[in-house]
Swiss-Prot record:
Native source species: Aedes aegypti
Taxonomic superkingdom: Eukaryota
Region of interest: Disordered: 1-30
Topology with respect to the bilayer: Single-pass membrane protein
Name by which UniProt lists this protein: Band 7 protein AAEL010189
Similarity annotation: Belongs to the band 7/mec-2 family.
Subcellular location: Membrane
InterPro entries: Band-7_stomatin-like, Band_7, Band_7/SPFH_dom_sf, Band_7/stomatin-like_CS, Stomatin_HflK_fam
Keyword Membrane recorded: yes
Gene Ontology CC terms: plasma membrane
Amino acid sequence: MGVVESITNSTKPGVTKKSSPEAEDDSNGEASTCGRILIFLSWVLVVLTMPFSLLVCFKVVQEYERAVIFRLGRLVQGGAKGPGIFFILPCIDAYARVDLRTRTYDVPPQEVLTKDSVTVSVDAVVYYRVSNATVSIANVENAHHSTRLLAQTTLRNTMGTRHLHEILSERMTISGSMQLSLDEATEAWGIKVERVEIKDVRLPVQLQRAMAAEAEAAREARAKVIAAEGEQKASRALREASEVIGDSPAALQLRYLQTLNTISAEKNSTIVFPLPIDILTYFMKSKESYEASHSHS
């Protein structure tokens, strides 16, 4: 019974929680001790193989690069190294080069169903760079591949919440929204999305024809409106001119002579008047006075 009770007590949650930190501390202590021994042996190897070991221990990274160093599987304190020369211990240190330059990624055409149920094909280009070399290596397996996949998904999701006319007329706004969304999502991967540009929006052929017909109809309607407005202005001008000519007999005669001059110039003909214009005017005035007297009587 005593043996059974001791086994039961060792499996109680309270006992497990109490012994777990101690076991973890012991394992950490053993790992640190083993690590110190390996580091010491590595330094001994460097000293014994001088100066040949310097060819292995010293590395160089370019201005646009950083080196993330792991010692016995753990990140070395101090962050990424570079640019310039840095030192590693043989056999126990490993490092990864990270390029900090801006990269471009052409998002392949994505078939998207817009908010108003129109299928369009949209492609874009994404400009991004590594902003934190250590995080881009330690937090994600492949930061570049993950960013590209996320760019495709973000493009589809963003376009799916917009109407077709918004996609066609608000490209800059949509690009800015995508850039903010991508930058926020990739911050945990050490990636900075600098810019997103929508390259092309391709519509179905039938929709293109329908939009072209609609645009043609709109142009014809505008042309008819402009023509109607022109006719209205011309009619108004003619009415004003007729009022002016009616109030001035001299203006009527001048206009009459101008018309005759135009006719004779076009047809190259001679016009003969049986009566002078003054006599015609006199008869016209006599007729008007006669009609006026009879109307009063």
